[in-house]
Each structure stands twice: as C-alpha cells, then as structure tokens.
Amino acid sequence: MNHENFRRCVQQCVSCAIECSNCATACINEDDLQMLLRCIQLNRDCAAMCRVTVEAINNNNPLIGEICDVCADMCDVCAEECSKHRHEHCQRCSEVCRNCAAECRAVMAPAAII
C-alpha cells in the first residue's frame, strides 16, 4: 500500500465532501431551485460517499478498492451534473469532484498497491 497515495485520496475526499455540501447549500438559496434539485441530491450523495471513503481508508477496510471505485463513479456523476449549471459554486464543485475521482482511481492503480 502506498501511504502517500492514500493520504492524497483522503485529502481530496475531505475537500470534495466539503465542497459538495457547500454547493448543495448554495443551490438551495438560488432562484432556479427546481432546476437544481438533481444537483442538490447528487451533491449530498457525493459528500456522503466521500465521507464513507475516508472512513474506509482510515480503518484499512478490506473493501477499499471497491469503495474507492464507487466514490470515483459518484464524483464523476456529480461533476457532470454540476458542470451543467452556470453558478460559480457548481463549477467549482465540478472541478473538485473530478479531482477527487482521479485520486480515488489513482489510489487503487496497480502501481499504487505495494
């Protein structure tokens, strides 16, 4: 196990959980709330998945690979949805989600497991 890769993944997951929570809250306060309902739900789900991933890594869960894969997929879906909206918080969240997905995938790349 490459501890540096896991450390970066945890950092990205924490950042992503915070950004997704902030984005969901900001979306709730927008005028076009109906157009943002899917974004809000995906933000909440992504934040929850990122928190689960951090706990799994910290606890050395035997399913880390599967959990990281699901987290990466969740981040991709959230990033895609956020990118559809013009709001700065959505665009920022999309970028953070993409970075998190990349770190989740990198942590389980064959070279990362030593």
Question: Which residues make up each language-model segment?
Answer:
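Amphipathic alpha-helical hairpins
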Residues: 1-114
